[in-house]
Amino acid sequence: RANCSKGTLYNYFESKDELFLACVARHCEGLQLEMLSLARSGGDVRQTLSDIGRSYVRFVSSHAIVRRFRMIAAEGERAPEITRAFYAMGPGRGVETLSAYIRSAMEAGELRQGEATRAARSFFSLCNGHRVKARLCNAEAEPAVAEIDADVAEAVRVFMAGYGT
């Protein structure tokens, strides 16, 4: 809720869609900044991937983000440019950020050589596991920290089995 009139809002945004995208961008930006910080932490690859994975799963499985994702998906029928913009700002940027980290780890010999973007997508898919779909379908409650830790530990284990040196 904004503490101002619609007129004031539309002085800044030309349409409801533009306002909606600005809100989405704001939420995506927080996760991107956290991921960048974790990727630049200079820690061990397993620990960095674990930290990024936990941050990501916590974010995408939270009640607020699940609700927003449902709204964005519903808007996609009416205005597909909104869902495309969301994908570019959210998941697309996340993959770019993680790809850059993975690429540098590959170049440093900490991960096996491969296609960094594909590896980043695979890592996020492993982190999503069943939980994101279950949350979107309201089949599960928001996960506890221990559940997130276990899911991400398994994702890192499987990822490192394929890309570890």
What are these regions (language model features)?
Residues R112, A116-A120:
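Membrane-interface starts of transmembrane alpha-helices
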